[in-house]
Amino acid sequence: MKFSPLVDELIQSLRCLPGVGPKSAQRMAFQLLERDRKAGAKLADSLAKAMSEVGHCQSCRTFTEETYCPICVSTKRGHSEVICVVETPADVLAIEAGGHFSGRYFVLLGHLSPLDGVGPDELGLDLLEQHLATGDVSELILATNPTVEGDATAHYIADMAKRHQLTVSRIAHGVPVGGELEYVDSTTLALSFNGRLPM
C-alpha cells in the first residue's frame, strides 16, 4: 500500500539506518507522526544540526564540533604519549566507558579492504604516520576488530610503527567475562589458549 509521498519519503529515509528494514521504518515513522510529533521535530532538528556542524577532529579523526575533540585537548589524560588505534568513533566511546585507558586515540574510520577500494590513504594513515614521526609517541595500541580486515589493518600499522622504533601491542582476544566455553567459537577458543597468562 502506498502512503502519501511525504510519509513514504520518511519511511524510506529511516531505512538508511543500520538494522532498520521496511517494517521497522514504518513503525518508527508512524510512532513519530501519530504519537510524538514534538519528539519527531526535536529529532529532525538535532539531526540537521549534527549533519551541518559535526566533523572530524584534526588530530584523532573522531567526531567533534570543534577543530579538536575534548580528548585531544585534555591536559588531564595521564598517558598522552600512548595512542590507541580504533576503527570507529563508537570504539572510542566503548573504550572510554571502560575507564581503563588514559591515552589518546586515532580513528581509522574503517579498515583495509582492497576489494572495497579502501587502502591506507582512505584510513588517514599518512596523518597517523605524521603523529608517529613527531617523537611524542612511545607506544601504539592496536584495537582493530578481530576480523580478517581488522587483522590486516593491524599488521600494516604495526609495520609502520616499527619503522619509528615504537612499542606496538594489540588488545587481547578471547573468552568474554561471564561467557560459557560451550558457546565460544573455535577461533576465539584458540586465541584464548594461545594468549593464556601465567597465574
From Swiss-Prot:
SMART domains for the chain? TOPRIM
InterPro entries, per this entry?
DNA_Rcmb_RecR (IPR000093), Rcmb_RecR (IPR023627), Rcmb_RecR_Znf (IPR015967), TOPRIM_dom (IPR006171), TOPRIM_RecR (IPR034137)
Zinc fingers (C4-type): give the ranges: 57-72
- Any single GO BP term: DNA repair
Domain of life of the native organism: Bacteria
Does the record's keyword annotation contain Zinc? yes
Give the protein's recorded name. Answer: Recombination protein RecR
What is the originating organism of this protein?
Answer: Shewanella pealeana (strain ATCC 700345 / ANG-SQ1)
Taxonomic lineage of the native organism: Bacteria, Pseudomonadati, Pseudomonadota, Gammaproteobacteria, Alteromonadales
